[in-house]
Amino acid sequence: MKILVTGFDPFGGEAINPALEAIKKLPATIHGAEIKCIEVPTVFQKSADVLQQHIESFQPDAVLCIGQAGGRTGLTPERVAINQDDARIPDNEGNQPIDTPIRVDGKAAYFSTLPIKAMVAAIHQAGLPASVSNTAGTFVCNHLMYQALYLVDKYCPNAKAGFMHIPFMMEQVVDKPNTAAMNLDDITRGIEAAIFAIVDFKDRSDLKRVGGATH
């Protein structure tokens, strides 16, 4: 099994991005699966262009995109990506699309095809906080998740794809009182646990367990 893992460069005034730092620490093989990690720019269309190049060349069985969600307390596999860019801040090249479809020929939304509840369970087993998230936002993270599912559907129809948000690193919150953060090694362990579940559930349906929210 081959798994493509992506991590964004820093954005929004941050000097580092835990997504990129964490995937740099991943081993080349996890649970027998070959792991390929790539950096993607925090730029709307350009991130998808980079992803497409690697999907076409690597032909992965699964794509896991990782992104920073400052303020979240745990690792959060995303359930759904919507076909809408609505940028609160500009991306790293100054683009700020407002109420713009990501793909005019795409679906209104794509659900993750990764075993998100099994991923949460595996992260819990590693002793780390995790939960299913029902919104990936409307910035580049949602954009890339949507594009990943669109591109996999087009170029690797038998592959799975999805996204997981991670918290700030400890170094990012020294001047942000009362802001949640996690040690980089723990973030990396959480991603490894999630990948273990992706491999383990390659030919199985996801766990059927409570993971919803009331609001």
Swiss-Prot record:
CDD domains: Peptidase_C15. Pfam families: Peptidase_C15. GO terms for molecular function: pyroglutamyl-peptidase activity. The active site is at 78, 141, 165. GO terms for cellular component: cytosol. It catalyses: Release of an N-terminal pyroglutamyl group from a polypeptide, the second amino acid generally not being Pro. The keyword Cytoplasm applies. PROSITE patterns: PYRASE_CYS (PS01334), PYRASE_GLU (PS01333). NCBIfam families: PRK13197.1, pyro_pdase. This is Pyrrolidone-carboxylate peptidase. It comes from Streptococcus pyogenes serotype M3 (strain ATCC BAA-595 / MGAS315).
